[in-house]
Structure formats: C-alpha cells, structure tokens
Amino acid sequence: MKEYKGKLNISKARIGIVISRFNETITKNLLEGSLDELERYGISTQNLPVAWVPGAFEIPLIAKQMALSGEFDAIICLGAIIRGTTPHFDYVASQSAAGILNVSLEINLPVVFGILTTDTVEQAMERSGVKMGNKGREAVQTAIEMIDLTDQLSLLRNHPHSSTANNTSVCK
C-alpha cells in the first residue's frame, strides 16, 4: 500500500487570506493566529495579501478571484458566524461553506474553511484563541498540509505510467 500524507514543512508557500469584517473582534484574533503560525513555519507575512470582505457570505467570491490569479498555492478563508434568533445563521453558514468548497473544487486549489460557526460569542472567543486554541492557526496548518499533499499527487499524476499522463481515463 502506498500512502500519501501532507507534511507541515513548506516555507515557500504562497498563501492568500480572505477575512470577514463582520464580528471583527473575533476575526482579528483568527488573523493574528494565522499570521503567527505562518511565521512559525517560515512563511513571510510581510507582503501577504489579506482581503477584507463585509461578511462570510462574500468570502467565496474573493477567494475565487484570488485563486484564479495563479499567484497562490492556497487560500485561507477566515470568519465568524454566530447564531442569532433568526435562520440567517443557517443560510450564511451553509452557503459560505458550499461556496468555499466549490472554489476549491473548480480551481483545483486548497481553499481552507477557517470560518467559525458557533452558538455564542463566548464559543467564538474560545475558538479564536482567547482561552485556548486558535482556529486561524489550524487553518494555516491545513493549508500547508494540503499544499504538500496536492503537490505529491500532482507529481504522481505526471508520472509516465499514470492514466492522466497517457491521456487515458480510469473512469469511462
């Protein structure tokens, strides 16, 4: 059996971040955690593009524009959606997730879902690093791992004996 696992050892990754201004106190914590984690892995944040959008619902469009630029190995999407008293939470959370997934699959690029979906502000604060873990840090780790894994699999795809390299398809 041949296993493929992404490794957390990329220091030259080109990463862009899309972040929601809504719930900015929380999203700034996520961004800070992401930037700290990027530096920890040796990825400079000095010229790192960070695109601020009004809310989580707008994240997929800007993530797609960044992905289509060809300038990035991965896009990290950060936001915080907190349940209120209306069904708005459900729509925004599900459509933001679906949009981010669609961008990743359409563009064939890691687009990481780093959007908190919580019932309370307290839960969001906890997950943004105020009391314990920071999901922004985890999003960076996911991006780095997925960059490495997709690189490994693209090398496999370009191998002379692969069905893709021979212009044949396993699925008919």
Curated annotation (Swiss-Prot):
Enzyme Commission number(s): 2.5.1.78
Keyword Transferase part of the UniProt annotation: yes
Any Gene Ontology biological process: riboflavin biosynthetic process
UniProt keyword NAD present: no
Domain of life (superkingdom): Bacteria
Pathway(s) where this gene product acts: Cofactor biosynthesis; riboflavin biosynthesis; riboflavin from 2-hydroxy-3-oxobutyl phosphate and 5-amino-6-(D-ribitylamino)uracil: step 1/2
Top-level enzyme category: transferase
Keywords: Riboflavin biosynthesis, Transferase
Catalytic machinery residues: 88
Gene Ontology, cellular component aspect: cytosol; riboflavin synthase complex
Listed NCBIfam families: lumazine-synth, PRK00061.1-4
Protein name as catalogued: 6,7-dimethyl-8-ribityllumazine synthase
Originating species: Protochlamydia amoebophila (strain UWE25)
